[in-house]
Amino acid sequence: LKLQLHDERDRFVSRRIREEGIWEPFETSLVLASLSPGAVFVDVGANIGYFTVLAADRVGDSGGVFAFEPDPENFFLLQANLNLNGVQRQVEAVRAALSDEEGEGGLYLSEDNLGDHQIYSAGEVRERIPVPLVKGGEYLQDRVERLDLLKVDTQGSEYRVMSGLMPLLRGLPMVPRILIELTPLSLQEAGSSGRALIELLATLSQPFWIVDHIEHRLVASSEAELARWCDNVDAVAGDRGFMNILVGSEVNFV
């Protein structure tokens, strides 16, 4: 894996990859274990393309990857990294933010965490740039016949992303695994809530798993447990507690 990274301004994703050669090791193994040649992967909030490139290499020429990233600087590096790794043919990269509506939105930029841009204002002083908003379900409807893994990491707009994708997911022959970030405070700032996201995901009737990236394991959970956790986080003002969760069948690590 060869990646063109952000400069020292980015204290998170690029810095970690520069220092350790990997980003989110357990999530990386989850993505790779969920994909095989011919599979289809959708990366929502693709950043500079770390997971996109890994997935494209995994699914090969017979598979497909769709990567959505609204920030122009991240998107430039995403495209550069596709070319650098020779996987541009199997990736459709789209400079847009997925949402539950079409049109134009604002992306509020973080100066030191270039993976923490948000499509809502949380009251901080941030530069705002216009970005296209796209309904994921409508965009992908005629482009995919199957979907194996969906990764959503959008700094609080996960509910709107999933709302826009639900018509597609419900119409597929098989519901994909979904790897998604759950940050109740960010979801609230974006006009939703952690509980609302969990209840929406539960309509897919798939198992829930907590991604334990410390012990590198999946911990079985439930709609009720995760909704309760969200309520507990909401009860503490300013609590930015978060976790990644997996929705779908258990992953077989080989």
Language-model features: where?
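Conserved acidic-Pro-Pro-aromatic motif
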Residues: 138-253
